[in-house]
Regions:
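Short phosphate-coordinating micro-motif centered on Lys-Gly-acidic
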Residues: 58
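Hydrophobic alpha-helical transmembrane segments
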Residues: 1-4, 128-148, 347-355, 480-510
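Aromatic-capped, Gly/Pro-kinked transmembrane alpha-helices
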Residues: 427, 442, 453-500, 514-623
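Hydrophobic transmembrane alpha-helices and their helix-loop junctions in integral membrane proteins
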Residues: 10-53, 62-425, 449
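Hydrophobic alpha-helical membrane-embedded segments
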Residues: 272-279, 356-368, 503-528
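Hydrophobic membrane-spanning alpha-helices of multi-pass integral membrane proteins
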Residues: 181, 209, 312-315, 433-447, ...
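Alpha-helical transmembrane segments
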Residues: 11-12, 217, 365, 507-517, ...
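Hydrophobic alpha-helical membrane-insertion segments
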Residues: 91-106, 312-319, 436-459, 544, ...
Length: 623
């Protein structure tokens, strides 16, 4: 509740300036959906039963749909809203079935009663006797997991979140960085007893989180739209959180181990909101420009120092800069506990690789956009920001369309130069935006305090999660106790500080060399020299590994064809039979209509024909 309500207040203040262009019906519509979202999220967090949680869950889904599609006359925004809603339906179905099965199996949906009834199964799990646990309990955990993966954008249901950047930037900061997308992580943490007694749920959570983190990081490295880079970063960090829950709670009975995932939720809320709002300030001031190849040296332009410093603080936290950032400590906890679990070392190594990639793409944005030679080209929205004049703006604003070479050449021909673009002058953010960025920057450092005072472990120890900490779970479940893994022969808790620090420095250093050293223009960098070497890999990563295209080919197009075939069957066969039943008498009537002409000789001929027919039938019957 602390960061749901606190961050919502700050983002509302930010939005009061950011959305000031749209004072009128649009302004009211935005804040109506915004406040309804905060209510729904609060309902979700404060619920003491699964039904009330589900009510809040569906509420935030509805508000997300409304806010992503805020620019309802922009086709790409409408498509993104529908995509988010439909993909989340898959996860929500899993959650609904899980709630129903929990009620059928245990006769209640209240957390306290459910955890009391699942208590005996905890003992079976500790002993490694999963064969004594009913299959329905395993099914409940797996169904809840599907719901969590949908809402928190994990494989294979992550594709909706990057497209959700079509909504206004405050929406991205609140819903798709700080609160709603972490609802799935909250669900797993809240229902941890069910996951702890499941033989497969926690390992699946750990592996799906790990693979999602790595996949999203590779995509983020190759994007040029800074807002979408942060979106893929969010997907990646959510994967870290799930790995923290899947690996840490499975590896140790120590509440400090289980605290890593929830603590990363807490720290991530601050620095990712700061990053999104900093990107939004740039978008707001440069007419919607988000292409990192068309912006440079922003931090040193008049009026942009606070935005630049806020971005720097956010990047340091996301990259896990050692000792001074909350992001370092929360990420370090996850990495250490991944190696503590002797059965999850592969997950640990992949998370280490992801940490290095994260540091690289994070400072790729900072070095390209905020430092270096001063240069800017305004975006397509010279008359507004975030599609403020959406009544006229109907073109799709995606990374590929706005970053095309043709657009770059056309803008250059209109008078772009080293320090600007024609007569356009960027307008720095006002007091509301700067104040929010300053407060969030301070909050990123204050978020370190819970780590040292052991605040999160204390909460977990006295929560339902404390019941679910099963020693030795997540491996082979032998019931022989907890085996403590090592990192190259060393205690992970002792050395992971240094390992993660080195990984972070390497990522930042590579970004510094490739995107800052020797760069003379905004559009070029030393990284371009690697394209011939990385060729196909770079193209696939820039194409988001063509997952959307795969889903189109395997799921959307076949379903579209099937729907049209069924439509034709329904129209020609089903409707055809029904319509034929009415068409036959109508055709008979039209056929007999010429006999009704109002002439006596015609009627007489008809009567004679009828009498003759009756006589003929009578003779046939007699014979």
């Amino acid at each position: 509740m602390l960061f749901v309500t606190g961050l919502a207040t700050l983002i509302a203040l930010y939005a009061s300036e950011y959305m000031s262009h749209d004072v009128g019906p649009g302004y009211c519509r935005f804040f109506a959906a915004f406040t309804l979202f905060v209510f729904s999220m609060s309902c979700l967090v404060m619920a003491d039963n699964l039904v009330l949680l589900y009510l809040g869950w569906e509420g935030v889904g509805l508000c997300s749909y409304l806010l992503i599609g805020y620019f309802y006359k922009k086709p790409s925004a409408v498509a993104a809203a529908k995509k988010a809603f439909i993909v989340n339906r898959i996860g929500d179905l899993g959650l609904a079935l899980g709630v129903w099965m929990a009620f059928v199996q245990f006769g209640t949906v209240e957390y306290a009663a459910l955890f009391e009834k699942v208590g005996p199964f905890i003992e079976h799990a500790k002993a490694g006797r999963f064969d004594l646990i009913p299959w329905q309990v395993e099914a409940i955990a797996l169904l809840l997991m599907v719901g969590a993966f949908g809402k928190s954008a994990q494989l294979p249901l992550y594709v909706w979140l990057p497209d959700a950047m079509e909504g206004p930037t405050p929406v991205s900061a609140l819903i798709h960085a700080a609160t709603m997308v972490t609802a799935g992580v909250y669900l797993v943490a809240r229902m941890l007893p069910f996951f702890a007694v499941s033989e497969y749920a926690l390992p699946i959570v750990a592996w799906v989180g790990c693979l999602t983190a790595l996949l999203a990081a590779t995509i983020g490295m190759a994007q040029f739209d800074i807002k979408r880079i942060m979106a893929y970063s969010t997907v990646s960090q959510l994967g870290y959180m799930f790995a923290g829950l899947g690996v840490l709670t499975a590896a140790s009975s120590d509440p400090a181990a289980a605290a890593a995932g929830p603590y990363h939720v807490f720290t991530h809320a601050f620095f990712k909101a700061l990053l999104f709002l900093s990107c939004g300030a740039v978008m707001h001031g440069f007419a919607g420009q988000l292409d990192l190849r068309k912006l440079s040296g922003v931090m040193f332009m008049p009026g942009w120092r606070i935005v630049g410093l806020g971005m720097l603080v956010g990047c340091l936290n996301l990259a896990g800069f050692p000792l001074i950032t909350a992001g370092f400590f929360s990420k370090d906890m996850i990495l250490a506990e991944a190696f503590v679990n002797p059965h999850m070392h592969a997950v640990g190594w992949l998370l280490l690789l992801t940490a290095g990639l994260t540091a690289y793409y994070t400072f790729r944005v900072f070095f390209r956009v905020f430092v270096g030679p001063q240069h800017f080209e305004p975006g397509d929205e010279l008359h507004g920001h975030d599609d403020h004049s959406h009544d006229q703006h109907t073109t799709q604003h995606t990374a590929h369309s706005t970053h095309s070479d043709r657009a770059h050449d056309e803008s250059a021909s209109r008078g772009a130069h080293a320090h600007g673009h024609g007569d356009f002058h960027p307008h720095p953010p006002g007091w509301a935006i700067n104040t929010v960025l300053a407060i969030l920057s301070v909050g990123c450092f204050v978020a370190i305090v819970p780590y040292f005072v052991k605040w999160v472990p204390g909460i977990i120890e006295h929560s339902s999660a404390g019941l679910a900490l099963v020693g030795g779970h997540g491996g082979e479940h032998t019931g022989a106790g907890h085996a403590h893994g090592t990192f190259l022969g060393f205690d992970p808790h002792a050395v992971m500080y240094y390992v993660s620090a080195v990984i972070g420095f390497v990522g930042i250093g590579v970004a510094f060399v490739l995107h800052y050293v020797g760069r003379t223009t905004a559009a070029t960098s030393k990284a371009d020299a690697l394209l011939p070497v990385l060729g196909p890999i770079a193209r696939w990563a820039q194409g988001k590994w063509f997952v959307d295209e795969l889903y189109d080919a395997v799921i959307r197009v076949p379903l579209w064809v099937l729907a049209h075939v069924l439509h034709l069957i329904d129209k020609l066969l089903v409707d055809g039979l029904v319509n034929a039943a009415g068409a036959a008498p109508r055709a008979g009537g039209w056929g007999l209509r010429p006999t009704q002409q109002g002439q006596m000789h015609g009627y007489a001929a008809g009567m004679l024909a009828g009498v003759a027919l009756l006589v003929l039938i009578g003779l046939m019957i007699v014979q």
